[in-house]
């Protein structure tokens, strides 16, 4: 997902109609809202030089049309009253873009019996009413799959359900009443599968306020692995609306086909199981102990080591050697996947992340303002189109950039490339063959990753001391 948790939606005044051709200018509140909405839910990449061109082909027009198509609006490409009205409605914050009805990689529970725990309660409803709403929301999915659910009262469940306000420890703070209602994570270990409700909402079991049963059933669909649907009748349609009470509620055929593509039909279900061949091919979730596993890039981050692969990364720390597995978008929603290179710049407490001719700076879970920037701002010649690997040597305060069979050295103190570079990799790192996938500097050694192998290089002896599997860092 692509986050896979909900991102905040800012609420701004509605205006009747704001076509892009002349009526909306940069800084107009409706344009600001539209830009924020498209960035969060439609993967819109801000480009100051292009956003406000008054042409039908401008990126913002195309993204507005994409949003209008997905949400079932007339594709005007303009911020008309219907579009603005929908942007202001409460909704789920999982992005709407995506090629499939399930999350990328099709994460799902690898078992049929799933536990859940209600960690705390909203003051808006009696505890037994909350218990009943959650139970009925799970029953919706249980009726059409082989899945069963049971509640536990202590310890860690597969799905941890809680109510919170504002900052609540997962990088996605809630935004107050009437906007983002809740968020959920796809199946997996740790916080994956969990559901968080914004307790600033007025939770009810009625058409007024925000109906807990309907929101819970939607979010639990995410917890089971479903993405958003563009069908308005679907429970997984992203915009909130009250439809009916639990007693009269039935999943749409779109919801049934989506969940059964992951788990199959339940023994008593009359619904049609989606044939495997009808589902578009999906990228595989990488297995950390696959003997052929390679990494896109590797970096340290505040005492941890991050291993990036496709849209995922493993996170290993000295105090917790068991690697954690995450989606890149769960921590940095605006970063691309399939990264080229990454390294930690200790002097700025940031990690620089490279893809193609651009790079981003992240500090903690925040992408820094003013990025992405072009790699040529670092001093590379125009002939360099991308970086293969990068690593920071803390003792010398130098960063090494590897491109093809050459490498550059960057002075992090003076912020310039050192003179005399590029140099041949094999001249200064004997035994290291180009092209390098990733480099890590730990324990006084350089670790060069190439395919499924890594080469431990001693810079003092100028020799390769060990050849290991790339995933040996992941306890494989």
Curated annotation (Swiss-Prot):
Binds 2 Zn(2+) ions per subunit. One of its GO terms (cellular component) is extracellular matrix. InterPro entries: Hemopexin-like_dom (IPR000585), Hemopexin-like_dom_sf (IPR036375), Hemopexin-like_repeat (IPR018487), Hemopexin_CS (IPR018486), M10A_MMP (IPR033739), MetalloPept_cat_dom_sf (IPR024079), Pept_M10_metallopeptidase (IPR001818), Pept_M10A (IPR021190). Zn(2+) 1 binds at residues 168, 170, 183, 196. It catalyses: Similar to stromelysin 1, but action on collagen types III, IV and V is weak. Residues 1-17 form the signal peptide. The active site is at 219. It holds the Pfam family Peptidase_M10. A motif (Cysteine switch) lies at residues 90-97. This is Stromelysin-2. It comes from Mus musculus. The lineage of its organism: Eukaryota, Metazoa, Chordata, Craniata, Vertebrata. The gene is Mmp10.
